[in-house]
């Protein structure tokens, strides 16, 4: 009986060991690095998620065609919802994800980045810009500007270009992306002799009627209205401002990129809207022209900065993997250590910036580009 029990315990230990080593056993047969991301592929924010997915796919195809390292990229739909994002992340983890593109939008990314940190799966998000995405997580990095940096940079740009001194701000107070940009903008404005004469808010549930906010801005003589928000509420603001015969200067942020391809939107309403973005689809360098041409041919749209940032994420991974002499049979945890070492020391040139670097907190250093919408297209201001 004792002998039988000993054999049973030994067998159980063997099964447990094999189960615990399953990740590395699966990776042993990998011929490509598995890179996963979540984003809104359906729903109101789907322009962002599909753009990121499309940009990442083009980059992976180009890198694979070179015949060196091979990449397999997979995206799961999170519908811009934190709970669904975690479920999507777990699906990717079960698939064998070794490296992550995080989540496309900030609130879901706050949830999935916690899982990235706990699981030691390195993440490089193209566009989730909230501070909480990377804060306290040594293995979560951003290709995009952080929200506070966008707020500060927007205030500096408005002041430097003399776009107006009396400013109204309309922002969404239950959205971390909007709040983060708003808070640093209004903090920086007084230093630059910008007077915030109107500071009004809305929520996700009230994002249909902006008459009160627009009336407040107009009555207080705002020359420029700053809109730190995504494109959908902005599209309603532009339409309602026109109906109210209010025509200030408009200044947005990178979340507004995508408004020109929004279904049913009259692009003439966005004429003259200015924003800061890291990517200009009309740039004349060969790499940008090639990317834009491929994107148009494949997907029928002009790529926005979400597509370009995701494209850059995949190329940054390729550069880091080559420099680290990494191989697809490595565990996610081993790759995580190598990526931290590479990203804190390397310099990267991409579509969205040159000589990009990252600090130990995962924040990227690159310069934004001023853009204005003219005749239904983005045109460089600088």
Where do the model's predicted regions map?
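Short, low-complexity disordered leader/linker segments with a strong preference
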Residues: 1-34, 65-68, 382
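Beta-alpha junction/loop-to-helix N-cap segments that form part of ligand/metal-binding clefts
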Residues: 24-32, 48-54, 65-134, 143, ...
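Extracytoplasmic "Venus flytrap"
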Residues: 36-57, 76-83, 105, 170-179, ...
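Hydrophobic alpha-helical segments within soluble ligand-binding/sensing domains
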Residues: 85, 143-166, 179-181, 207-211, ...
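An alpha-beta-alpha
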Residues: 140-201, 224, 317
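Extracellular/periplasmic bilobed ligand-binding domains
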Residues: 184-276
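Extracellular/periplasmic periplasmic-binding protein-like sensory domains
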Residues: 238-311, 372-374, 378-380
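Segments of small-molecule ligand-sensing domains
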Residues: 297-304, 318-378
């Amino acid at each position: 009986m004792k002998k039988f029990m000993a054999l049973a315990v030994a067998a159980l230990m063997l099964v447990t060991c094999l189960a615990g080593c399953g990740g590395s056993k699966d990776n042993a047969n990998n011929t490509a690095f598995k890179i996963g991301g979540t984003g809104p592929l359906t729903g109101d924010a789907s322009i962002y998620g599909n753009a990121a997915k499309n940009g990442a796919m083009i980059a992976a195809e180009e890198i694979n065609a070179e015949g060196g390292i091979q990449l397999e990229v997979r995206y799961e739909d999170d519908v811009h919802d934190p709970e669904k994002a975690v479920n999507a992340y777990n699906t990717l983890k079960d698939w064998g994800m070794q490296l992550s593109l995080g989540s496309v939008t900030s609130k879901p990314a706050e949830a999935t980045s916690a899982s990235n940190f706990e699981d030691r799966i390195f993440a490089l998000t193209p566009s989730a810009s909230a501070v909480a995405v990377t804060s306290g997580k040594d293995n979560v990095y951003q290709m995009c500007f952080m929200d506070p940096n966008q707020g500060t940079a927007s205030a500096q740009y408005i002041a430097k270009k003399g776009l107006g001194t009396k400013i109204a701000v309309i922002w969404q107070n239950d959205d971390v992306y909007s709040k983060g940009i708003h808070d640093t903008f209004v903090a920086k404005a007084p230093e630059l002799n910008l007077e915030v004469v109107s500071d009004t808010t809305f929520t996700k549930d009230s994002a249909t009627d902006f008459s009160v906010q627009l009336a407040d801005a107009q009555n207080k003589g705002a020359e420029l209205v700053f809109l730190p928000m995504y494109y959908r509420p902005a599209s309603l603001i532009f339409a309602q401002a026109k109906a109210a015969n209010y025509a200030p200067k408009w200044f947005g942020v990178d979340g507004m990129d995508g408004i020109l391809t929004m279904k049913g939107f009259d692009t003439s309403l966005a004429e003259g809207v200015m924003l800061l973005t890291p990517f200009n689809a009309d740039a004349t360098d060969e790499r940008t022209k090639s990317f834009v041409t491929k994107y148009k041919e494949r997907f029928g749209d002009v790529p926005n900065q979400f597509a370009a940032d995701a494209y850059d994420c995949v190329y940054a991974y390729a550069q880091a993997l080559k420099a680290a002499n990494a191989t697809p049979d490595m565990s996610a945890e081993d790759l995580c250590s190598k990526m931290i070492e590479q990203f804190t020391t390397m310099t990267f040139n991409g579509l969205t910036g040159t000589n990009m670097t990252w600090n130990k907190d995962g924040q990227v250093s690159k310069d934004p580009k001023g853009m204005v919408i003219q005749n239904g297209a983005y045109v460089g201001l600088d």
